[in-house]
Amino acid sequence: MSSKTDEILEQLKGLTLIEAADLVKAIEEAFGVDASAPVGGGMVMMAPAAGGGADAAEEKSAFDLVLEEVPADKKIAVLKVVRSLTNLGLKEAKDLVEATPKVVKEGASKDELKQLKKNLKQLEQK
């Protein structure tokens, strides 16, 4: 890091909680961002399925479903969704959920992903 960033870091370390909260609010207003981004159920990332050098303008029809992380309080519910999606046994699904990030399904269609997204949204509400 540069000396300027080191100096800023040292100044930040000296802030009280109230000063830090005020700083966060000021940064949010100045840059138009929200520091309270939602942290919800299992984070799922859709990665394009491996399949050569397709044209970028062509719409993807198959995706790899990657499970990024699973909050401890949602593990059982995510495990059920993974089992229904992959037809794995309980032990295999548990190992997959605990070894994130992991590809859950390869070559999934958009419809499958929409259904999974719906299932995960329901998990977040429970």
Curated annotation (Swiss-Prot):
Q: Which Gene3D superfamilies match?
A: 3.30.1390.10, Single helix bin
Report if keyword Plastid is assigned: yes
Mind telling me which SUPFAM superfamilies this protein's record contains? ClpS-like, Ribosomal protein L7/12, oligomerisation (N-terminal) domain
Alphabetic keyword roster: Cyanelle, Plastid, Ribonucleoprotein, Ribosomal protein
What's a GO biological-process term for it? translation
Gene Ontology cellular-component annotations:
cyanelle; cytosolic large ribosomal subunit
Q: Name one GO molecular function term.
A: structural constituent of ribosome
UniProt-annotated location(s): Plastid, Cyanelle
Family annotation (PANTHER family): 39S RIBOSOMAL PROTEIN L12 (PTHR45987), LARGE RIBOSOMAL SUBUNIT PROTEIN BL12M (PTHR45987:SF4)
Oligomeric form and interacting partners? Homodimer. Part of the ribosomal stalk of the 50S ribosomal subunit. Forms a multimeric L10(L12)X complex, where L10 forms an elongated spine to which 2 to 4 L12 dimers bind in a sequential fashion. Binds GTP-bound translation factors.
Q: Which family does it belong to?
A: Belongs to the bacterial ribosomal protein bL12 family.
What is this protein's function per UniProt?
Forms part of the ribosomal stalk which helps the ribosome interact with GTP-bound translation factors. Is thus essential for accurate translation.
HAMAP family linked to this entry: Ribosomal_bL12
Q: What is this protein called?
A: Large ribosomal subunit protein bL12c
Which species is listed as the source? Cyanophora paradoxa
Name the gene.
rpl12
